[in-house]
Amino acid sequence: MIKRTLAMAILMAGVAWRLCGADTGPNLIAAVHPESIRIDAAYNGARVTVTGSIPSEAGALIRVLGKAESYKLKQKGRVLGLWMNRGSVEISKVPGLFLLYRPTGAGDAQSTDPPELGLESIRQGAEVVAQDQNRKELLDEFFKLKQKAGLYGTVANAIRYEPATGPLKSFTAVLTLPAALPQGAFEVEVFAIQNGSVVAKDVRTIEVNEVGLPAWISTLAFQHGTLYGTLAVLVAIMAGWLTGTLFKAGKGAH
């Protein structure tokens, strides 16, 4: 009897906690479409639509993050007036993709970016191993490479609000994803921001997969390296031969 009474008390306490917890914080509801992206031979970037609702007094920010990765790069410099490799650099604990999407007309107090959501937070968490210990300069160059590829950056005017209805307002965001998007799982983080602080958060996931020719090339490169290298050499030889043939034919026509 005592055990049964105790079990019932625990169950009722759990129900009460859930009911009370539903009203303790601001609401944020988000949906992502599509939830998967196929990279085929014709892929040249994609668009993902995020819809949802946030507290009417808050602003929205959306962040798309890839998993943390490690990069090994060659450090170049001048030696006797010539550009040469001067060592290697390893940069780790940085995401493969970092895109921050902001609302139309952003700049009010509602949508001020909290420091922990911006690119500076990625910089602070990054680890750099190099012979030249100029960490800031190395990260600056690394971020420039990522931004040039469209894999890091901030996109303005990406989120549009609907008029508030009661305590909530709806939003729609169109997220442009780069042509250089790697395959894998990416988190779509939706934040409600008020007075420069995160008051609510929702997370969704999109899956990116290579199909067709890109998938075949990746499989060949990673699982059959020798064959891939041989084919690459043959393709280069054929391309050179074809270019030379066309060039000679063009000269002969004149």
Predicted segments — roles?
Residues 8-18:
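Bacterial N-terminal signal peptides
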Residues 25-43:
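N-terminal edge beta-strand
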Residues 49-55, 174-176:
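Short edge beta-strand/loop segments characteristic of extracellular beta-sandwich folds
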Residues 53, 63, 67-89:
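Membrane-embedded segments
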Residues 78-178, 182:
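Membrane-proximal low-complexity regions enriched in glycine and acidic/polar residues
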Residues 176, 199-230:
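Short, aromatic-rich amphipathic segments at membrane interfaces
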Residues 180-210:
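Extended, hydrophilic extramembrane loops/domains of integral membrane proteins
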Residues 236-254:
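Juxtamembrane interface at the cytosolic side of transmembrane helices
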